[in-house]
Amino acid sequence: MTLTNRPKKLGGRVTTSRTARKASWYPNNLQLISDKALENANDLLTYLKWNEEHGITLFRVGSELFPWHDHYKLHDLPDYDTISEKLFECGEYAREHGHRLTTHPGPFHVLGSPRDEVVEKSLIGLERHSEMFDLMGYTPSFENKINIHVAGAYGDREATARRWIKNWHRLSESCKSRLVLENDDKASMYSVRHLYELIHKYIDNPITFDYRHHTFCTGDLSEQEAFFMARETWDMHGVTQCTHYSESRRQEKKLLIEKMFDHHNISLDTIHEWPTFEKEYKNFCKIKEQAHADYVLNTPNTYGVDSLDVVVEAKAKELAILPILEKQKELLIL
């Protein structure tokens, strides 16, 4: 049994991202949100214990552990004390067992936005994520990173970077001590080089290197060059570098489509005779190049580096991680 497919009779799917429709609670039913947050905190401990049993020591906490967190103060939640105690228990367990916890707030946290209202909500949201780690008992550090993107260049990378830095200075010291930036997956946005030259040089923040994103936005660097440029930004703080690895959902589905065509002797000229397969093919054609695959078949090139944390971004979550761990065991046996 895994956590993603846990049967309902055993409690159902484990997640740290339960939420609710805004209309179902706002503004007079904060208890509903409090209930969701407590369930999320309880499941975080379930995740950590399962990870320990399976040799997984890196975990990304759901960014909606406190649903709609920019609409209230955490201490206003009816179950705040109980939630705080549970989160501290989670942090204590993670520290005792050598687990690293991180989080990745959603794409609406945009410090470089030209719109004041977007920036204000972003500042609140980032502070809530930092407060979550505070409740877990963590000293502010890039070890428990809050990972975001610049999330838009607005036609002028340099001006947007300056706005981003200006608003970064408005964050609390604890939040700034956790906030890291990740390279983008669009050529018009921010590569590792752009992040390094336009932002890191001014505030010394670490850069999370995303292998797949680099293929879309290289900044005229090879993968190896970008990897080590990002690594330098972690080394200067004495914190283990964290990277992201994923594979192409489009390529994953392409292999399945090709097998389907071969097995049934289908071509694009005859696919209309197979309505079910035609629907599958049309869905395949809609998949964006940047989309993450459900699983990963390979592991990233770490260029001889031993001290490195790799977050595997795959839709199947721990179901995608287990086969990788099995492969590693086989290699150790060999």
Q: What positions do the PLM features span?
A:
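Multi-pass alpha-helical transmembrane bundles in non-GPCR membrane proteins
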Residues: 150-152, 157-167, 179-183
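Short active-site loop/helix that positions an aromatic residue
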Residues: 215-219
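Alpha/beta catalytic barrel-like cores
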Residues: 1-100, 107-138, 142, 170, ...
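Short, structured patches in soluble enzyme cores that scaffold and shape functional sites
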Residues: 105, 147-152, 181-185, 209-211, ...
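Contiguous N-terminal and early-domain "leader" segments and peripheral loops that mark the onset or edge
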Residues: 126, 132-133, 143-154, 210
